[in-house]
């Protein structure tokens, strides 16, 4: 008799995706982050659902409803901080996942890569709208500043901003629609994740060496399911420590002050995981130029396959490219730090240099160094 997991219509799909999936035998722990993201999404949706049961999307009561969740709801503080810090962990995993894709040349699977970029944009939009919901000072001013960037679009900019706001400023209509979108987007993200996996399983996983691994595959379960579980346990312990010992470490103290349109905070900044993009935006004095740089800092990922000039797929055997990659990582960490600093000397200058270096590495240095490595290997 055939095993039920191989014959049942639904179980068969799960079996081919997570149990009997042929997987390269040499993939490292950097490949854990894809499954980690899927696992991170589940508690985000569950905690979000419980928060939505008690939250009210109204400017007069939003702030106090969040305070009510933390004070009066059974384990409300735990649900709220797990949701907030879970988002930070989600983004750390997301950036590592993208970084691994760049390092090992996974972007050569163009459909999977492009689907991943759509997912990245969706997650960023969801996180931004979620940050607005507690209706603290930073929520309100963050929403005002970031949505206002669209006014830089020629001709239609102002109308577009007012259309998004649902009025002439960030107000009740904005909060209501942001809550609606923040609620629905995670389910859209889940659907997009399935499509992302579908494209991945068409080609099979990449591996650290970057060469074809069809001749050397092993089943996903139990080998990689246990390996992924270890990764999940590791992240879960960090998240738990963050939630229970220092829940406000990654938050902003200004968000404990109710939103006040008449009082601007001294330093408006987004969540910690958007600071690198915010630093790139601020480094250009022109508004439209800044917005373009901000969008391009993420959109640049789409052209990664076109910038690949190396004869080897992975950076595993390319030390010069490896050096460039880690300079890029250090540069992004510098940008993250700059984004959290006030707009004054020397931070402005460091931000401008780091932004320039970011685009230079990806657009010019990486393709050039890859070509040099080809020459050195007489390819």
UniProtKB/Swiss-Prot annotation:
Gene3D superfamilies in the cross-refs: Cytochrome Bc1 Complex, Chain C
Cofactor(s) in the UniProt record: heme b
Pfam families tied to this protein: Cytochrom_B_C, Cytochrome_B
Membrane-crossing segments per the record: 33-53, 77-98, 113-133, 178-198, 226-246, 288-308, 320-340, 347-367
Keyword Electron transport found: yes
Binding locations of heme b b566: 97, 196
First-listed, main subcellular location of the protein, grouped into a coarse class: mitochondrion
Binding residue positions for heme b b562: 83, 182
Subcellular location: Mitochondrion inner membrane
Alphabetical GO biological process terms: mitochondrial electron transport, ubiquinol to cytochrome c
Positions bound to a ubiquinone: 201
Molecular function via GO: metal ion binding; ubiquinol-cytochrome-c reductase activity
Membrane topology of the entry: Multi-pass membrane protein
GO cellular component term of the entry, any: respiratory chain complex III
Family in the record: Belongs to the cytochrome b family.
Record text on subunit structure and interactions: The cytochrome bc1 complex contains 11 subunits: 3 respiratory subunits (MT-CYB, CYC1 and UQCRFS1), 2 core proteins (UQCRC1 and UQCRC2) and 6 low-molecular weight proteins (UQCRH/QCR6, UQCRB/QCR7, UQCRQ/QCR8, UQCR10/QCR9, UQCR11/QCR10 and a cleavage product of UQCRFS1). This cytochrome bc1 complex then forms a dimer.
Further information: Heme 1 (or BL or b562) is low-potential and absorbs at about 562 nm, and heme 2 (or BH or b566) is high-potential and absorbs at about 566 nm.
Function noted in UniProt: Component of the ubiquinol-cytochrome c reductase complex (complex III or cytochrome b-c1 complex) that is part of the mitochondrial respiratory chain. The b-c1 complex mediates electron transfer from ubiquinol to cytochrome c. Contributes to the generation of a proton gradient across the mitochondrial membrane that is then used for ATP synthesis.
The name this protein goes by in its record: Cytochrome b
The organism of origin for this protein: Fukomys amatus (Zambian mole rat)
Gene name tied to this protein: MT-CYB
